[in-house]
From Swiss-Prot:
Homooctamer. The eight monomers assemble into a closed ring that binds RNA. It comes from Beet yellows virus (isolate Ukraine). GO terms for cellular component: host cell cytoplasm. One of its GO terms (molecular function) is identical protein binding. This is RNA silencing suppressor. It is found in: Host cytoplasm. GO terms for biological process: symbiont-mediated suppression of host innate immune response. Acts as a suppressor of RNA-mediated gene silencing, also known as post-transcriptional gene silencing (PTGS), a mechanism of plant viral defense that limits the accumulation of viral RNAs. Binds to ssRNAs and dsRNAs in vitro. Also functions as a replication enhancer. Keywords: Host cytoplasm, Host-virus interaction, Inhibition of host innate immune response by virus, RNA-binding, Suppressor of RNA silencing, Viral immunoevasion.
Amino acid sequence: MKFFLKDGETSRALSRSESLLRRVKELGTNSQQSEISECVDEFNELASFNHLLVTVEHREWMEQHPNQSSKLRVPSRIGEMLKEIRAFLKVRVVTPMHKETASDTLNAFLEEYCRITGLAREDALREKMRKVKSVVLFHHSELLKFEVTENMFSYTELLKLNLSLRVISSQILGMAI
């Protein structure tokens, strides 16, 4: 099944992952947005390739070991590096809604949403959380110095937003990265 994935492509992806890991470790708070965006784009390319590679390897492994659990498989080296890269790309950002736990953050978003819209908490709870988050973030967009775009809540846009602001952890937005 691996006929379309050459070993050269895998080793190139591995060396690109190592190179990207070195680059993201060197990123500082004064890094240019363009440099950060390049890292995010390269991370996304490597993540797509790794997903394809893992899918192919998983199928091959299941064909060779049909009676064993797939949990016994060893994770790929690229996948391990991508986890480390992602950890370096995740940054903390402080907003008026930032709290230490996810449930406190959710409550802070709801309180801020109620304050902005004038709705009661019970009514706010009936709203979709995506709408609550977007209203609150839009309301604070000037303060946070980012432009709200229509695809802002896609994974890549959230990651770019987090990197450029240097203020919000993924748990604030309710995403598990």
